[in-house]
């Protein structure tokens, strides 16, 4: 279904950015400003960062701004009162703005479970989805892919790895194996004993990508890569055993596909998230993009390692949840969001992250119901249980 993408005609595309103040959102704005003849930021939304969304709105002059935190509504409204910009607040408003008739593309770049319902609303409104919120497919992959097929909506991946896989696809040629690359995170060379004592500051020092705090911690535990495995299963319709995680510290190969004849096709480049963002907006066209270029002569070596699930059990838990199916990935995601925040707030140690997730997987009732109601209730139960374990 992700190839159902005959959406880009010659008119300027109006983009709704869910999460304009985050890492993906700010880089998407850079892409839009580089190609202001092709794209327009029609809607900007933020959860809490009123100051940044105000400055973005004053610069980009969108039609609509939404601040999800209702306590910040008056601050945003008053700061933009001299401009003809509609300002709304609250989670419900996020689901409403994506349905605006003038919106062509919804960039789903909110972090976490909060991105699920606005993405569903956008699919039902038949908007093209540029998907950066991986939790949407982790939590509700079955539901999302079913809705995308039903409403004939294209889903274009924005994750660097999934964009790489998407760029390597050959319609009509089956995927034998997906090679999902991973930098290995800041603790790649740590022993099991050393990992027991790492701090949030150690974890936030990611070696390659500039990301928000939540995803940086997930990258340190390899849960981020586990989520990407689940995401790849739904985006590309492959079985879990067809997805192989490959540790590639240089982050030059962003991912690859092996075809049935054994040929491997990879996408290479410098680590710049603007490229997958722009490609999701412009597909099937490629547009100029300013910035660094990959210089093959400067590469000393490209190395590859197997992931160690003894030292990084979160990757194993993600695979287990995918094999079990049903609401198990939803349970893992909910518990992970709780422990991720607790670790960032210095309330738990690093080893507790995987331990609490695993205990939550064992405790919360399993269900094969793929309705939104089931996912909402599972998410609530799993969060509450994980919080009690902290």
Question: What are these regions, as identified by a protein language model?
Answer:
Residues 1-10:
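N-terminal amphipathic/basic-hydrophobic helices that include classical n-h-c signal peptides
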Residues 11-390:
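Catalytic, metal-anchored helix/loop core of enzyme active sites in primary metabolism
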């Amino acid at each position: 279904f992700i190839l159902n993408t005959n959406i880009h005609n010659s008119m300027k595309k109006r983009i709704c950015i869910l999460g304009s103040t985050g890492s993906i959102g700010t880089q998407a704005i850079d892409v839009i400003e580089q190609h202001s003849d092709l794209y327009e930021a029609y809607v900007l939304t933020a959860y809490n960062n009123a100051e940044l969304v105000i400055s973005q709105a004053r610069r980009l002059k969108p039609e609509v701004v939404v601040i999800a935190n209702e306590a910040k509504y008056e601050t945003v409204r008053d700061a933009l009162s001299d401009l003809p910009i509609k300002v709304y607040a609250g989670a419900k408003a996020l689901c409403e703005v994506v349905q605006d008739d003038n919106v062509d593309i919804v960039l789903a770049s909110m972090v976490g479970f909060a991105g699920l319902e606005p993405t569903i609303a956008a699919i039902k409104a038949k908007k093209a989805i540029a998907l950066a919120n991986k939790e949407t497919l982790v939590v509700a992959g079955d539901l999302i892919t079913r809705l995308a097929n039903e409403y004939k909506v294209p889903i274009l991946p924005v994750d660097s790895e999934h964009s790489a896989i998407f760029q390597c696809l050959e319609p009509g040629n089956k995927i034998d194996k997906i090679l999902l690359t991973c930098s290995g995170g800041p603790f790649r060379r740590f022993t099991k004993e050393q990992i027991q004592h790492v701090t949030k500051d150690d974890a936030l020092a990611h070696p390659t990508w500039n990301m928000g705090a939540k995803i940086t911690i997930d990258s340190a535990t390899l849960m981020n890569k586990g989520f990407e495995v689940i995401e790849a299963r739904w985006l590309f319709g492959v079985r879990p055993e067809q997805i192989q995680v490959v540790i590639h510290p240089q982050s030059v190969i962003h991912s690859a596909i092996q075809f049935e004849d054994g040929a491997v096709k990879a996408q290479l480049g410098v680590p710049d998230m603007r490229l997958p963002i722009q490609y999701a907006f412009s597909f099937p066209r490629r547009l100029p993009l300013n910035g660094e270029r990959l210089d093959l002569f400067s590469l000393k070596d490209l190395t590859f390692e197997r992931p160690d699930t003894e030292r990084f059990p979160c990757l194993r838990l993600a695979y287990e949840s995918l094999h079990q199916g049903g609401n198990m990935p939803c349970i893992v995601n909910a518990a992970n969001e709780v422990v991720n925040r607790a670790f960032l707030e210095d309330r738990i140690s690093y080893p507790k992250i995987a331990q609490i997730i695993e205990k939550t997987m064992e405790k919360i009732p399993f269900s094969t119901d793929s309705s939104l109601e089931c996912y909402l209730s599972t998410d609530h139960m799993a969060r509450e249980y994980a919080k009690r374990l902290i």
